[in-house]
């Protein structure tokens, strides 16, 4: 009787876990959701976080921990506790070290510039230790805030990834199925939004009005008094429900790899071909350098690994054909926009009063022109990719300037860095030493002077150099130790004779991890919760593989 009751409990808990997992995958579409529509009572524990996936994965984490406890998996629970302690203590040391390096220059003016939870911690500490000097009170409050921030980061990233790995180790096939369900549902939502957004590329007024109405739900428009994210992206490109086109491109990098896997390994190949085509087309129409590069890079990695391990060229040719059709479709859309006189980031045409429908009589001429060699050589996509390597193109001066400055700061403080909260005070001399300067950087420098040494007014464009500058080698290991351990495990697996053969899901996950690494060189990895989900699935893949090998099985 007790066993039956325990089994029923486990079944119910697993269903809650699975539902939370699928919902979390679907909600990766909303990494900057407006906090006006999130219950305020959640803010103290979640820090008013606008990444919607965090909330279902919090439920996932609670019930996963409960399941491990009921199954008496005490070693795993102890491992999680020790990992949390090491993670939090490590970032506490980094924060205290960073504050110690600048404490002599901190004034009351700097303290008055503190905001949010940092200010709350300082006020509480000041009441408890009102007789102590400023340096003492600040060191206590900043240390407490570092522990608070580190714990939140651990429970939202490391804990979720570990629990996905542990919980789905025994039923990895179910994890794969749930992941694809979540991706498919999210992509259907993307398509539904594109029914509204796509006509805007041809100057549709009704499309504009609908977007103006619904976009404030998806992200906080003009957040904190800045221009970003705007209500409507003025470059006449796709961004869907995301705050900017590059974030949409990041998401599409994952969907292209997922749909390649489904096309090759599942039925309904026409459906997956259409979804793959749309993923490519949407990515091209974002006109995002990083988005296009991620989609093409993910395709390249997947096709190379598949060709080496599976030796089935026909599928690769099918994928390349779909890619070529999407490329032509992009050029067709661009030509229609040019005929409409719509000014875009890559189409400097003067505005006219003539609106051309994509279904006009000249559709075949336009489509034919989309395949012309001259058009391909000088297409918007090629021009977009070229700007990645130009120092003066778009935001590259700012991007490369901050990246080289962070690298310099990290090399000068290699062990513990300078502290995430205090790096702003080091940026101006580092930028000057690297020889980077422009109007945007000058604005941040002036803002840094106004906000004081306890704040950081500079944006980060490279997750790895930023982490290295903030926390040195220790911070890098704490943040990315799990990620690079999984990469090493997959590489070792790849070079085994039977490596990925039969493990096609490993090819997909490794390709997604390659996308994550590439994205990290231009943005924060946390811009999409797919980072955490893919880490967890990869860990589950590796753990389940080890379990199966013990039983002399060879397939996942």
Language-model features, listed with the residues they occupy:
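Long extracytoplasmic/lumenal interhelical loops at the membrane interface
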Residues: 389-412, 416-474
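Transmembrane alpha-helices of multi-pass inner-membrane enzymes
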Residues: 23, 60-65, 299-300, 314-317, ...
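N-terminal signal-anchor transmembrane segment
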Residues: 2-107, 530-537, 542
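Helix-loop-helix junctions and helix-breaking kinks within/between transmembrane helices
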Residues: 35, 50, 96-97, 148-152, ...
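Aromatic-anchored transmembrane helix interface
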Residues: 50-58, 108-167, 178-181
